[in-house]
């Protein structure tokens, strides 16, 4: 049925989107740790000045994990919420929206610390390669734009065919 197709598509899209965003976020955290020699959030003031590409990747991956448009997590969450509503399983709304709120909380906590001003950037004990920084950024951007790959440019695909995500789900069955 349409509801099961939406749930299947939403679940698969959630898995791929979450994996790419989380990989980008953990890679960014690893680069920050490698550069500073610690992972204490309270001591990260000025990191954005020292590692701007890495912090941008962390922020974009966090936005993707929150499920903001046009991320794959947004489309996945929409499909899963629609499927839950269609099958009377309203409690999934609490789980999905609670997860997004929790994600927003920890992403904002880290970003508030790394973006906090400081006269100078914190001491970098080891330089990280630009290639690693850009690989991290590519993962974050990929997750952020995953819904566009599934539907085409958003919101055009949704405006022309609001059932496009549901029809995509039924083709997978």
Give, region by region, the residue ranges found by the protein language model:
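Short amphipathic alpha-helical coupling elements at transmembrane boundaries
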Residues: 42-49, 116-117
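Interfacial segments of multi-pass membrane proteins
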Residues: 1-3, 76-92
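Membrane-interfacial loop-to-helix junctions in multi-pass transporters
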Residues: 5, 48-57, 87-92, 131-132
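Membrane-helix interface motif
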Residues: 65-80, 146-163
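Hydrophobic alpha-helical transmembrane segments of multi-pass small-molecule transporters/permeases
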Residues: 11, 15, 31, 59-65, ...
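Predominantly late transmembrane helices and immediately cytosolic-facing juxtamembrane segments
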Residues: 22-26, 90-132, 173
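Glycine- and aromatic-enriched alpha-helical transmembrane segments of multi-pass membrane proteins
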Residues: 134-155, 165-173
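Alpha-helical multi-pass transmembrane bundles of energy-transducing inner-membrane proteins
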Residues: 1-42
